[in-house]
Amino acid sequence: MRKIISMLFAVTIVFGYISNASAKTLKCQTVLNPKADEVVMLKDFTDTVTTLTGGSLKFEIMPAGTVVGGKETLDAVDKGLIDCGFAWTHYWSGDHPAAMLFGSPVAGGGVGIDNLAFLSWFQYGGGKELYDRLWDEMGRDIKGFMLQPVGPE
């Protein structure tokens, strides 16, 4: 069963396939507090998904620490303890140095790659394939999706 995770340089969401066909609510733990702007935008996104699916797919968004600690979110999705996770990929740069490429792209102060160039590279220039390879090299059965690109800080 393939787990799907979304944790990119920005912030993204993670999904896991549900083995129970009658399940309609995905439990998604973030690495943030519930009032963070990113969580507000995540809830807007999941509300849109719920609307587009006619209510057949819903999300329970849980703050960091609800099921596992923030740093354990990736493992929890991989092991099926939660259905979704929401974080920045660079949280796992200690597990693989390439995670920083997706969590903190080279840019800033007019030097390097901006958000538009990063999104273009990710979608059409081989970035998505490298992102998949990152999780494979980390031994995770997951797949990433980008939801909220944020630029360099």
What are these regions (language model features)?
Residues 1-4:
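Positively charged n-region of N-terminal signal peptides that target proteins for export
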Residues 6-11:
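Sec-dependent N-terminal signal peptides
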Residues 14-23:
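Sec/Tat signal peptide C-region and signal peptidase I cleavage site
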Residues 27-43, 64-68:
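Extracytoplasmic "Venus flytrap"
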Residues 35-60, 129:
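Short, polar/charged alpha-helical segment
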Residues 46-47, 78, 83, 88-153:
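Contiguous mixed-secondary-structure segments that line small-molecule binding/active-site clefts
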Residues 60-62, 145:
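General small-molecule cofactor/ligand-binding pocket signal
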Residues 62-75, 150:
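Short helix-initiation/N-cap motifs at beta->coil->alpha
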